[in-house]
Amino acid sequence: MSNSLQVLITKFHNYIKYEKQYSDHTIKNYLIDLTQFRNNFNTEDITTITTTNLQDYISSLHTMGLDSSTIARKKSSISSLFNFFCKKKIIDKNPCKKL
């Protein structure tokens, strides 16, 4: 299976839409959050993303002046994505666990 972040986000989208049956509104927000997240990294290989990378990303959201509830939602989106990666055995350890 490819570790391309975009390919895996598409698989995650299908998972939350068809298996988890999230609302269209939730799916839309997750995809916006995850697209912004993907655009922040210079890698397409998700196995190289560390807890430190995620902490830096969250810190940058604070620096941008985003509302705390918006940041919490973005963290939730990212955490759900990495939980999916673990569930599907794409990664061994979830870097979100220590956020």
Regions found by a protein language model. Give the residues of each.
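A detector for short, charged/polar N-terminal pre-domain segments
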Residues: 1-7
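N-terminal core-binding DNA-recognition domain of tyrosine recombinases/integrases
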Residues: 10-25, 31-99
